[in-house]
Amino acid sequence: IQRVYDQCIQVKDADVFIATDSEEIKTSCTNFTENILLTRKNHPSATDRIAEALEQLGHYESVINVQADEPFVDPKLISNLFKALESKEVQMVSAMKKIHSVKDLHNPNVVKVVTDMQNNALYFSRACIPALLDEENKKITNEELKHSSQSYFKHLGIYGFKRTFLA
């Protein structure tokens, strides 16, 4: 958690808070920050926890949810998500990254995302979508992926919301 926190505090003009339902995590995090919010335990998702945290804080108009399993999150990515939320048309943002390895493409732990032409997410899957096979229905190689006309993207577990979206 501290590594994620340390990455997040590098974002200029951003206040960083840890939202948790665990007294144990709260106590542990007091070693490096006082910005800890204790939330209810019964949230069905992290987004619900973020909504409660934003309600507790009261005065922020947008929030970026960086989960604790992202110790190498790029502070520039967080800044870019905040920047995207400045648009009046944008209520919620997330991030994706091009997949360059067949191993990642077929790894069910890597969530894939399909987007429309404006990069709006259409759907997510742990499977390779659309399916990528050669003419004989065999998985392709990294070199073939590199030269494929189809781009594949992995979803990054980071989300940004406007307060009004979470209300």
Task: Annotate each predicted stretch with a short phrase.
Residues 16-18, 63, 93, 121:
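Hydrophobic/aromatic residues located in beta-strands of well-ordered beta-sheets
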